């Protein structure tokens, strides 16, 4: 969930302000762009969840802090058809700012009161809550926040994708 910054920090103990970080980050991102789909797979239960959402006539989208150059090839690789995609470089701000969620809702003419936003990082929940969207913390994924998921102030915590289908909105 912390992207290249988090991976480089964990692997090499290097931070963005350190000498050599920019070069290392560029090399990493170039490599990632070439190989990101090599071992990529959707989390267990996600394909079925998306099929069920679509079968119900609902729409779903992707709102990520990952840049478009990485997002769109993965969407194509996994043969996904989201109604909307908002990447980290789509707007001038990214999560935890709520604006990417508001932008996505506006793009598909949807209301916050009728939406659910699920995420595996506290930034996701902060963005959803800021956009007044029902927030769901998922217990699968990267869970990059140092805070326990129970402390994220989510409207709901789920343990597997199938639980998302039964959500009744309360916001």
Region roles according to the model:
Residues 19-20, 81-84, 112-116:
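Short acidic capping loops at alpha-helix termini that bridge into adjacent secondary structure
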Residues 95-125:
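Conserved Lys-Pro-Asp/Glu-containing loop-to-beta segment of HAD-superfamily phosphomonoesterases
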Residues 65, 89, 121, 139-142, ...:
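Short secondary-structure boundary segments
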Residues 55-58, 108-114, 171:
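Glycine-rich phosphate-binding loop signature in dinucleotide/nucleotide-binding domains
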Residues 1-48, 54-56, 67-72:
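N-terminal helical cap/lid subdomain that shapes the substrate entry/recognition surface
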Residues 80-95:
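A short, structured active-site edge motif that brings together acidic residues
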Residues 47-55, 105, 125-129:
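Surface-exposed amphipathic alpha-helices with a cationic face
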Residues 116-156:
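Acidic, Mg2+-coordinating phosphoryl-transfer loop and its flanking beta/alpha structural elements
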């Amino acid at each position: 969930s912390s992207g290249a910054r988090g991976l480089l920090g964990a692997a090499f103990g290097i931070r963005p302000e350190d000498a050599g970080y920019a070069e290392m980050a560029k090399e990493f991102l170039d490599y990632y762009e070439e190989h990101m789909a090599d071992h990529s797979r959707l989390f267990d239960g996600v394909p079925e969840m998306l099929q069920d959402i679509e079968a119900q006539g609902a729409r779903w989208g992707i709102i990520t802090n990952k840049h478009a150059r990485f997002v769109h090839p993965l969407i194509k690789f996994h043969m996904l058809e989201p109604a909307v995609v908002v990447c980290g470089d789509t707007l001038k701000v990214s999560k935890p700012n709520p604006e990417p969620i508001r932008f996505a809702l506006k793009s598909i003419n949807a209301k916050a009161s009728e939406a659910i936003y699920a995420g595996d990082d506290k930034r996701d929940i902060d963005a959803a809550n800021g956009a007044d969207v029902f927030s769901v913390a998922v217990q699968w994924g990267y869970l990059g926040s140092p805070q326990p998921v129970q402390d994220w102030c989510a409207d709901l915590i789920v343990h597997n994708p199938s639980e998302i289908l039964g959500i009744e909105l309360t916001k």
